[in-house]
Amino acid sequence: MRPNNRELNQVRPVKITRHYTRYAEGSVLVEFGETKVLCNATVEETVPRFLKGQQQGWVTAEYGMLPRSTHSRMQREAAKGKQGGRTMEIQRLIARSLRAVVDLKALGERTVTVDCDVIQADGGTRTAAITGACVALHDAMSKLVADGVLKENPMKGLVAAISVGIVDGNAVCDLEYVEDSNAETDMNVVMVEDGRLVEVQGTAEGEPFSHMELLQLLDLAHQGINQLLDAQRKALGL
């Protein structure tokens, strides 16, 4: 039996709270069960040097975990003087996922940075971050339209992500920490509204997984992400 008696294909309760902080152009607290991530989107009237004069914008992301977001305190990466490989991998994943649903030409020469800070971690922090960051980004873009800076929202749609895996021989959706730490196979899937995939990260922690198991996991992810997309649309009133 899964934690909280969930079915194999059942996602955790999802809550998306918009306008969570005061200053950011887009601010969302996203909750996947006990995993909670704060996503703040900031708009700046500048672009990276490699995009100067290209008449297009940029979307990027940063990711971090608060020291006591886990069972025992972690040292802040700032105190260590460098970011870890996991952090850099995750924030690049978030940024790639967001850029997949933005018309960068329509954004103009602006940069939107989405800061994703994990307040509490219980598995699936990167997938929750992507799902919440998309809503924060949508709000930031909508503000540019409302303020008369842009004529149309550059968002081409929504993107969401979920974890799937094989635990005790069963394919399961939206893994909690206790499942993730014991999974034979762990996979993160990022998908846009029409079902196309942005990224699939899959690893066999023990026994290799079969082609049929891969297809089963992707089907589970598709079902779960559709529920997340529904939650995003409901939060945004779309």
UniProtKB/Swiss-Prot annotation:
The protein, known as: Ribonuclease PH
Biological processes per GO annotation: rRNA catabolic process; rRNA processing; tRNA processing
GO molecular function annotation: 3'-5'-RNA exonuclease activity; tRNA binding; tRNA nucleotidyltransferase activity
Organism of provenance: Actinobacillus pleuropneumoniae serotype 7 (strain AP76)
This protein's UniProt keywords: Nucleotidyltransferase, RNA-binding, rRNA processing, Transferase, tRNA processing, tRNA-binding
Keyword Transferase among record annotations: yes
SUPFAM superfamilies on file: Ribonuclease PH domain 2-like, Ribosomal protein S5 domain 2-like
Family: Belongs to the RNase PH family.
Enzyme Commission number(s): 2.7.7.56
Keyword Nucleotide-binding on entry: no
Catalysed reaction, written as an equation: tRNA(n+1) + phosphate = tRNA(n) + a ribonucleoside 5'-diphosphate
CDD domains to which the protein is assigned, alphabetical: RNase_PH_bact
Description of how the protein assembles with itself and partners: Homohexameric ring arranged as a trimer of dimers.
Coiled-coil portions: none
Signal peptide: none
HAMAP family: RNase_PH
Domain of life: Bacteria
Positions annotated to bind phosphate: R86, G124, T125, R126
Function, in words: Phosphorolytic 3'-5' exoribonuclease that plays an important role in tRNA 3'-end maturation. Removes nucleotide residues following the 3'-CCA terminus of tRNAs; can also add nucleotides to the ends of RNA molecules by using nucleoside diphosphates as substrates, but this may not be physiologically important. Probably plays a role in initiation of 16S rRNA degradation (leading to ribosome degradation) during starvation.
Family annotation (InterPro entries): ExoRNase_PH_dom1 (IPR001247), ExoRNase_PH_dom2 (IPR015847), ExoRNase_PH_dom2_sf (IPR036345), PNPase/RNase_PH_dom_sf (IPR027408), Ribosomal_Su5_D2-typ_SF (IPR020568), RNase_PH (IPR050080), RNase_PH_bac-type (IPR002381), RNase_PH_CS (IPR018336)
EC class: transferase
